[in-house]
């Protein structure tokens, strides 16, 4: 009984001595609140820097990223100017951001005919869904900017994925 009591006393003494060390352990790994960087709108689209990308055989629209506008921010956001040309002759230009970690996207501004930008009134991030109407966002997420849900390392990696037609980490079987 004495040896059990003694061992218990030693255990409790060590546990009490170490508890302040372990108490701070969780604090060391607190997750920080994500903070978005201030966004600078890019220059107007340039024809020579437009890179087409494949979305789906189910759409007649054509999709382009302005490679000159492409950035990978320290805040984990891929930003890019997107041009969508419809089969009927419509033209839609937006400056957008994509958060791979959260699988979200956001429109910062819409492009005007004169090349200027009109800031978006909707500032919230929305989930990227692989549905027909927004398939181009899912394609950018899955095939080019966020392979496996992980953000590309830098602009060069994103540009190379767009030029190749897919990210090299996407395995096709």
Write out the residue ranges for each language-model feature:
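Bacterial N-terminal signal peptides that target proteins for export
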Residues: 1-10
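Long, low-complexity intrinsically disordered regions enriched in Ser/Thr, Asp/Glu, Pro/Gly
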Residues: 11, 22, 172-173
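N-terminal signal peptide c-region/cleavage motif recognized by signal peptidases
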Residues: 18-20
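N-terminal secretory signal peptides
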Residues: 24-95
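A short, surface-exposed beta-strand/turn
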Residues: 94-104
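A short, surface-exposed interaction/processing loop segment used at functional sites
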Residues: 102-128
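C-terminal partner/receptor-binding element of secreted or periplasmic proteins
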Residues: 118-173
């Amino acid at each position: 009984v004495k040896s059990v009591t003694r061992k218990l006393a030693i255990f409790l003494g060590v546990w009490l001595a170490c508890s302040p060390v372990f108490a701070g352990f969780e604090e060391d790994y607190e997750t920080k609140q994500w903070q978005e960087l201030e966004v600078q709108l890019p220059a107007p689209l340039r024809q020579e820097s437009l890179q087409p990308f494949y979305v789906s055989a189910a759409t007649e629209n054509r999709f382009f990223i302005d490679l000159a506008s492409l950035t990978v921010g320290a805040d984990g956001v891929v930003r890019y100017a997107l041009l969508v040309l419809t089969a009927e002759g419509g033209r839609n230009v937006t400056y957008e951001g994509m958060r791979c970690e959260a699988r979200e996207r956001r429109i910062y501004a819409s492009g005007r005919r004169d090349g200027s930008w009109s800031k978006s009134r909707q500032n919230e991030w929305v989930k990227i869904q692989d549905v027909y109407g927004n398939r181009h966002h899912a394609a950018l997420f899955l095939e080019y900017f966020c392979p496996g849900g992980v953000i590309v390392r830098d602009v060069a990696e994103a540009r190379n994925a767009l030029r190749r037609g897919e990210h090299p980490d996407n395995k096709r079987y």
